[in-house]
Amino acid sequence: MVTNSPRLRVLIVDDEPLIRWSLAETLEQSGHAVVEAGDGQSAIRSVSDGEPFDVVLLDYRLPDSNDLNLLATIRKLAPGSAVIMMTAFGTPEVMMGALKLGAYQVIPKPFEIHEVAALVLRAHVAPR
């Protein structure tokens, strides 16, 4: 289903293939261009190479990254990208730390895929 919303470039960073696939399918059906990364190093390469992303969906806990450090690196490499952090470890410390580092929002897992798709649009138009 293609809508009248802008076509965004979205990076999905999660080590769970099913989550990446579900988000990618929904966002692509809305007309967005999606790139997937299954680990922190792939995410850094994707952000460093090529055209910038409008929105980054970032899992908090990845096997090869140090939690909030990856968020800080992405914010430094791509200050124009809105970052939405996804986490099953939504303690107040994690949420506040992510927001202080520039995350647009922190969302708990599990989540509704269509709600995340709507959040991607809101994050894109929000001031950074």
Write out the residue ranges for each language-model feature.
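C-terminal output helix
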Residues: 92-93, 111-121
